[in-house]
């Protein structure tokens, strides 16, 4: 099935609001195995809206119109679609009762005849009830084309789509099942190069790479009638691609850190710390607490984190962490020595199992002869202190700091997995 999204509202064209509904709807249609081929925005103008509907009806099987269901004169979506289809507007009793209840509880809010428009449906439509607002949506199929009208506010549209529209559409379509694989330590171009043959010859399942800040994800997708069949196909493709080696001969399996759209290196590390019963601390310079902030984003962070340090200046590194100032001056702030000492001292001072030290040059200027983007990360445990140097080139200060924290999380993650013999 080919779908088209039409956003109705002059405020979208003038840049007053961002059309976030398009992203949400495209995602939901993809989950249903419905291909969205076109997205259009049109102002509150009957003539132009009629033209857009006519174009959409000739090239799409499903036309979804968002916005323009309110009570004012410029809310003309239902009226215009009804005119195009040659149908009348009728009153939906359930939506009308909701209007009655709404105004009965708001004695000081005047009800006008225009409010009745919010309870109108195109004749022959299936009503899509609005759980969070007043304007009823609708679905109607005419001459093989299904038309859907939805309210514009996301707070009304999203529940209506999830609870009303999706069940209606899913009954007649194979669903799209997806799995997101997350990689760290490889760029998008390197990953795509490694998977070139698979991507070039893909049919179903499909592979879609996405570059994120400091990491890359792969979305594997297949259309199937059930989860078991989808898992079988996705498992086969995943095993195939993870066995492939990069240009520097690393198996992709070793660069995979987790799964899921909402996952992160911080979350993976946090879960490993909880599972292993380990505690962690950090002393941060260039990241200024970013590592600790991300770690404590998760409920239950106090199980693995007691506290830490932000030691931005050389004097604070000496005073708060007890590192001899003369040694810091001799080795330099941006050095493996300083990163290791920060990690080791933070660990001892907080009686934690693991200590992390982050120091470097966020930029844009060089520091101590080290170019912008140079980062040293120290990791200390009871038995070992080590450090990692990375150069994050061509990035903003914000990106350097963010990616430095990612490297720190990955360093901890790998150390924890190694202790469990999982790497």
From Swiss-Prot:
SUPFAM superfamilies: CinA-like (SSF142433), Molybdenum cofactor biosynthesis proteins (SSF53218). Pfam families: CinA, CinA_KH, MoCF_biosynth. InterPro entries: CinA, CinA-like_C, CinA_C, CinA_KH, Competence-induced_CinA, MoaB/Mog-like_dom_sf, MoaB/Mog_dom. Coiled coil: none annotated. Belongs to the CinA family. NCBIfam families: cinA_nterm (TIGR00200), molyb_syn (TIGR00177), PncC_domain (TIGR00199), PRK00549.1 (NF001813). This is Putative competence-damage inducible protein. It comes from Streptococcus equi subsp. zooepidemicus (strain MGCS10565).
